[in-house]
Amino acid sequence: MAQWNQLQQLDTRYLEQLHQLYSDSFPMELRQLLAPWIESQDWAYAASKESHATLVFHNLLGEIDQQYSRFLQESNVLYQHNLRRIKQFLQSRYLEKPMEIARIVARCLWEESRLLQTAATAAQQGGQANHPTAAVVTEKQQMLEQHLQDVRKRVQDLEQKMKVVENLLDDFDFNYKTLKSQGDMQDLNGNNQSVTRQKMQQLEQMLTALDQMRRSIVSELAGLLSAMEYVQKTLTDEELADWKRRQQIACIGGPPNICLDRLENWITSLAESQLQTRQQIKKLEELQQKVSYKGDPIVQHRPMLEERIVELFRNLMKSAFVVERQPCMPMHPDRPLVIKTGVQFTTKVRLLVKFPELNYQLKIKVCIDKDSGDVAALRGSRKFNILGTNTKVMNMEESNNGSLSAEFKHLTLREQRCGNGGRANCDASLIVTEELHLITFETEVYHQGLKIDLETHSLPVVVISNICQMPNAWASILWYNMLTNNPKNVNFFTKPPIGTWDQVAEVLSWQFSSTTKRGLSIEQLTTLAEKLLGPGVNYSGCQITWAKFCKENMAGKGFSFWVWLDNIIDLVKKYILALWNEGYIMGFISKERERAILSTKPPGTCLLRFSESSKEGGVTFTWVEKDISGKTQIQSVEPYTKQQLNNMSFAEIIMGYKIMDATNILVSPLVYLYPDIPKEDAFGKYCRPESQEHPEADPGSAAPYLKTKFICVTPTTCSNTIDLPMSPRTLDSLMQFGNNGEAAEPSAGGQFESLTFDMELTSECATSPM
C-alpha cells in the first residue's frame, strides 16, 4: 500500500502530526494529488545532487501540468485555480534552488515514514496501554473534553432556567400590576379588602419563589465561572504551555510539533460558552430592571459576575493569540529563529478562537524589540527595523484548515546604524550571535462591545549579518531552547545556564535525525561525549558549559566542538546523505574501537568515519590488511573534504580507490564494508553508470578519443603495504593501464580503454594526520 494511503488510515492524533508537516513551502494538496509519483522519486539523492534535483523539479512541474489538463477536461475550476497557483509559487521559489524543494520533500517523506513506524509500534505493543506517557496525555485530554462538555451543558441548563425565571417574572409583573389596578378601584368603591389580601399573599409567594430562583441562578453562575476558570487554566497553563514547549523542541530538530486544531476547538468552545454566559449575566440586568426588591441577589452579585466573565474572556483571547510558525528564512528551513539582515524571512500567527465574525477584522502589526529599547541600549545590543509587508489582516482563507491566521512572507531586518558601527555600546559583553531579539505581533479585537489588545512574541531570534555566523547563531538557538521554556529571556546569555550531557546528547542526535533519516547511536554519542568531556565510563548527568560546547577550542585543536560538529552535519547533508541514511557511515568512532572491530575482520574490510582533525569537516575510510608476514595492519586514507567531494562523489571514490605499489600495479584494497557487505552492493547504486557510447573522433584526428575515468590512487614506492602512506595521492593522465595495471588490449572498435587519474597533490608519500 502506498505510504500516503497508509497515512490516511491513522488515528486522529497521528493525522494532527501529519498536518503539521506541511505548509505553503510544500502544500499538502500537492502531496495528495501526486502521491504515487512523489513516492517513486529519490528525493534524498536529489537533495544532494543539483543536476538530479533540477531534473526532478522539472518533472514535478510536468506532473502538475498533467493534473491541470485532467481537471481542465473535467471542468474543475477550483482545482485548476489551485494547481496554477501552486505551480507559480514553486517556480518563483525553487526554479533557481531545486535542491531546496528536494530537501523539503525528502524530510516530509521521512517524517511520514517515522509517523507510520510510531503508529505501528504502538499497535504492536497493545496501543496506549503500554505507553504510560501517551496514556496519561490521552486521559488528561479526555478529562478536559468532559469538563468542556460539562461547561456547555451547564450553560444550556442555565439558559433554560433563565427562561423560566423570565416567565415567572412576567407573571409576577402582570399580577402585581393587575392587583394594583384593582386595589385602586376598590379604594375608590370602598369594597372589602379580603380579596386583595389574598392576592397579595399569592404575590408574596411568587416573589419568594422568584427570589429563590434568582439566588439559584446567581449561585450556579458563580459555580459555572469557577468551572470555566479551571478549564481555562488547564488549557492555557498546561495544554497550550505544553504545545509551546513542543514547538521549541521542534524548532531545534526534535519530534514534529502536534498541530493546533484540537487545541483551537477546545479554546473556541470555551470562548463561545463564555460569551453565552456573558449574555446571560446581561439578561440578569434586564430582569433586575423589571423587578427589584430589598435583598435582590442580582443587585448584590451581578457586577462581580460580569467583571469575572469579562476578565476570563479577555485572558482567554490573549492566550489564544500565538505564533504558529516561528520566524525562519526559507533558504534555511531546518534552522528557524536565525535571521540574516537583508534576507527575507517568514512567520505565521494564529488566533485559536475561530469566530467567523472576526474574519478580516484583525490587522496584525509586526515590530522587533518593542519592550527592550532601553535594555538593548544598556547591554549594547544592536537595533533593527523591520522592512517589507509588516502589517497583515487575519483571515480564514489562506490556511488549509480554515483557521484565523496571518502569514508574513516578505519580512526583512535592517540594522540601525550607530556611530560605532551599529552597537549601542562598544563595551557590550555579548557577541552578536549571543544577542537575543523578540519579534512582537500586535492587534486589537472589538467584539460584542469589548476592546481587547492582543500581543504575542516569537521565540528569541538571533540576527546575523553574514552567513558565516550561522553555526554559532544556531548553537545559541539550540542552547536556549534546550534549557529554558521562558519565551522572553533576552538576557539569557549574560549568564548562560549549564546543560547536562543527557540534554546535549538528545539535541545533537536531533541535528542529524531532523535533516536525514538517521539520528546518532549510543556508541556515536559516547564518542562525542569523550571529545567534549574527556575519557570516562558513564557520562550521564555530566555538566557541560556553554563555553565548552561552543566557544572554547577542543584539546589540541584550533576550533570548538560545535564548529567541528556543525561542519560534519553540513558535509552529511550536502555530500554523503544517501550513504548516511543507509547506515553505511559509522561516523563517530574512537581509534581504539576502530582498531578493535577491524582487526578481527578479513583483509579488505573497511569502515567510514569522520575526520577528527578537519575543522571544515572531512570523511575518510579505514581498512584492514595483512602484510607479507601475515600481521594485521590498519590503514586510513587522508580525509576527503567538501572541496574534493564537489568533484567526485564519495561512493565513486570508494569504488575506484586504488593503491599503486612500487611496480606500478594498481590494487583495490577495499573489498567489504563493515561488517561484511560487498562494496559493490553498498556503493554501486550510488555511482553513475559508465557510458556505453564510443566517443566521437576529433575532426582533425584520424583516431577516436580514448575514454577517461577519474579514480583516486595512493602511490607507494614500498615493497609491501606495511608502510602504506595514509594520504590519497592521485596520478594524472596515466594511460595504457587496465583494472589490474596490465597493458590494455585494443577493443573490437580499435579503441584503447584508458584511466585518467586526477592529480591534486604532488608529494609521493605522506603520513596521515589521522
Swiss-Prot record:
Q: Does the keyword DNA-binding apply?
A: yes
Q: Which InterPro entries match?
A: p53-like_TF_DNA-bd_sf, SH2, SH2_dom_sf, STAT, STAT3_SH2, STAT_linker, STAT_N_sf, STAT_TF_alpha
According to the UniProt record, list the residues that bear N6-acetyllysine.
49, 87, 601, 615, 631, 685, 707
Identify the residue span(s) of motif Essential for nuclear import: 150-162
Gene Ontology biological-process annotations: astrocyte differentiation; cell surface receptor signaling pathway via JAK-STAT; cellular response to leptin stimulus; defense response; eating behavior; energy homeostasis; eye photoreceptor cell differentiation; glucose homeostasis
Q: Any idea which residues bear N-acetylalanine here?
A: 2
Family designation: Belongs to the transcription factor STAT family.
Q: What else is known?
A: Involved in the gp130-mediated signaling pathway.
Describe the task this protein carries out: Signal transducer and transcription activator that mediates cellular responses to interleukins, KITLG/SCF, LEP and other growth factors. Once activated, recruits coactivators, such as NCOA1 or MED1, to the promoter region of the target gene. May mediate cellular responses to activated FGFR1, FGFR2, FGFR3 and FGFR4. Upon activation of IL6ST/gp130 signaling by interleukin-6 (IL6), binds to the IL6-responsive elements identified in the promoters of various acute-phase protein genes. Activated by IL31 through IL31RA.
Record's protein name: Signal transducer and activator of transcription 3
Query: Lineage of the native species?
Result: Eukaryota, Metazoa, Chordata, Craniata, Vertebrata
